[in-house]
């Protein structure tokens, strides 16, 4: 069984972001990396939204920016401008394609999908898989909406 220098458990946003940053910053030169992901394929399965407080490498995956928002309570409304800290939404499909395209150029990076066992001997392991009690948070941000596409 092949041995790896690094193993990332979880090939979602966190795990793939870590692998991407290691690769583009030349930290994987002469190193092997295994990414373990339970899903069998990547598709647009979600969007990620956040306040942009620093520059990041995924501007080309951003599908929407908001520079203001409003807080509405009963009959009151207050609009806030956030030009310096826009709220951004990243499309997971664009993100997965960008990352996997870059990582596939390095023959020492292996993406294992739907794997039950891997040799972890002498490997540095990064576990980005959520803990089983991760959804017990008291604060949850959720948006409901409809996407409409027109020709």
What do these predicted ranges mean?
Residues 17, 21-77, 94, 144, ...:
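N-terminal FAD cofactor-binding segment of flavoenzymes
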Residues 44, 82, 136-137:
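Generic domain-boundary/flexible-linker signal
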Residues 1-14, 34:
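Beta1/beta-strand and adjacent pyrophosphate-binding region of the FAD-binding site
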Residues 50-113, 118-122:
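A conserved beta-strand/loop capping segment in the N-terminal third of enzymes
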Residues 4, 30-31, 123-124:
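Nucleotide donor/acceptor-binding cores
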Residues 14, 41, 131:
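Conserved Rossmann-like nucleotide-cofactor binding loop
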Residues 7, 39, 129-130:
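Anionic group-transfer/hydrolysis microenvironments
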Residues 11, 21, 25, 102-151:
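Predominantly flavin-linked oxidoreductase catalytic cores and closely associated redox partners
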């Amino acid at each position: 069984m092949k041995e790896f220098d690094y193993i990332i458990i979880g090939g979602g946003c966190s795990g793939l972001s870590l692998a991407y940053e290691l690769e583009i910053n030349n930290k994987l030169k002469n190193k092997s990396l295994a990414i373990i992901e339970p899903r069998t394929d990547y598709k647009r399965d979600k969007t990620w939204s956040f306040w942009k407080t620093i520059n990041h490498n995924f501007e080309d995956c951003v599908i929407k920016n908001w520079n203001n928002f409003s807080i509405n309570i009963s009959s009151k409304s207050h609009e806030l401008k956030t030009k310096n800290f826009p709220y951004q939404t990243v499309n997971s499909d664009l993100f997965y394609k960008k990352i996997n395209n870059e990582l596939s150029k390095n023959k020492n990076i292996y993406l294992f999908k739907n794997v039950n066992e891997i040799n972890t001997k002498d490997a540095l392991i990064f576990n980005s898989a959520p803990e089983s009690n991760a959804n017990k948070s008291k604060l949850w941000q959720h948006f409901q909406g409809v996407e409409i596409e027109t020709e």
